[in-house]
Amino acid sequence: MTGGGTRLPVIGGVQPPAAAPGFERIAIIGLGTLGGSLAAAVRQAWPRSLVIGVDTRDVIETAMRLHAIDVGSDDLMIAGDADLVVLAGGVAESARVLPHLADAVASEAIVLALGGGSAVTERAGGLPGRLPLVLGLPAVELRGRGIHASSADLFRGRRWTITPITALPEAVERIHGLVRAVGGDPVAGSGRRPGGQADAL
């Protein structure tokens, strides 16, 4: 149609491009309800990002069948090229993994721990400067356990308390972008640096 007529949508036409991902390679360590939900939500929000899962072989196989991750392994070294590492296996597991991240992750990456506590923050000082740590506490109600209870919509409309531990504002803002991308609402928590007063997270 020419002139000033109305342009009708073309069926099967070119779709608008997906939003540019805030992170290119996201490694999620622990694919339970939280980790699996975050993996699925990230794949929806940022389809061009590579989502890497780290868990037991059985869980990795299930996550692959559910299309929650792109690749996975029970070996932490698969996270070596990640630019975001998410610790989603619970406080005790996060504290256990933290000392091994410097050897496993070769490049610069932001480390996001889902949940916190002294067991995690006290080990933050052992991380090199290229691995800044942020705590993220999503206000969600879990209705089950494990990867089968995960949902890409778990974080939609939910508040996240974001607390920098060794991270600078630029890294924290990137985590805010992640939270917004999966439908959440990031709010600032009071930071704690190693040797300072602990947060009530």
Segment roles from a protein language model:
Residues 18, 76-77, 103, 125-126, ...:
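Short secondary-structure boundary/capping segments
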Residues 2-75, 80:
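NAD(P)+-binding Rossmann beta1-loop-alpha1 motif at the extreme N-terminus of oxidoreductases
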